[in-house]
């Protein structure tokens, strides 16, 4: 018997953090016969944000699309849902990871995301946190992971350019480029 085609939904829930709220959401997802394929949770100020990639039959996805807004209203949550597709992607030949500590100021994160965008590096993850320091400007800590198509050829220039950007901004930064071996083409 053929497996039914899976359908996918990206769901984001944002609301005031409180004990048990994530369990309530995941219980609702399960009750609709959806599977959580991937998820991220973050506490930002007094709010939480929960992002999930759900899979299920067409009926299961339609069920969560129609019932979650009622549950979200009861829980005082803001939700965003969007259907999507999940197709196997060709592996990227390389990954780039950076970690930066720098005095916080406006536009710092933008300068690093621009560094990645201008080199056609596809940001896969970005995390940042501002840390208070007694009598000093707060410290901004940034971690970014990105996929890279051309790093096997341009690895040294990416590394050199990253260090030059850190020096220009007075940042302490580390970069790691991992080039994956590719299967030989027949």
Residue ranges with predicted function:
Residues 2-186:
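A conserved regulatory-domain signal marking ACT and ACT-like small-molecule sensing domains
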């Amino acid at each position: 018997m053929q497996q039914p085609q899976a359908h996918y939904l990206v769901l984001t829930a944002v609301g005031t953090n409180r004990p048990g709220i994530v369990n309530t959401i995941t219980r609702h997802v399960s009750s609709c016969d959806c599977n959580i394929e991937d998820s991220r949770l973050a506490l930002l100020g007094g709010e939480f944000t929960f992002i999930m990639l759900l899979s299920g039959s067409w009926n299961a996805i339609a069920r969560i699309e129609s019932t979650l807004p009622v549950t979200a209203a009861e829980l005082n949550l803001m939700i965003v849902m969007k259907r999507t597709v999940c197709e196997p992607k060709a592996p990227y030949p390389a990954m780039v990871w950076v970690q930066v500590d720098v005095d916080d100021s406006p536009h710092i994160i933008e300068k690093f995301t621009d560094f990645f965008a201008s080199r056609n590096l596809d940001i896969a993850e970005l995390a940042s946190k501002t840390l208070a320091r007694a009598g000093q400007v707060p410290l901004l800590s940034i971690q970014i992971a990105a996929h890279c198509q051309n790093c096997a050829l341009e690895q040294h220039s990416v590394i050199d350019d990253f260090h030059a950007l850190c020096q220009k901004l007075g940042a302490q930064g580390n970069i790691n480029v991992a080039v994956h071996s590719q299967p030989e083409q027949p």
